[in-house]
Amino acid sequence: MVYVLLAPGFEESEAVVPTDLLRQAGLETALVSLSGPTVSGSHGITLCADLELSQVDLSNAEMLVLP
């Protein structure tokens, strides 16, 4: 599992582009919020997270993306 961690003020392109490419490659990828069900990036774009950090089991993480 690949987790893309989203904190308020994240760089949108650094989150969306890798997520898209990883999913196209067939890797299970989840957007993970550090601050609630939605997170706003540095340019005011809001994304809905697949999971909140409290729901994540990092022991099965193959990769972490930190935008």
Regions found by a protein language model. Name each.
Residues 1-67:
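Extended, subdomain-level signal for the structured scaffold at the beginning of enzyme domains
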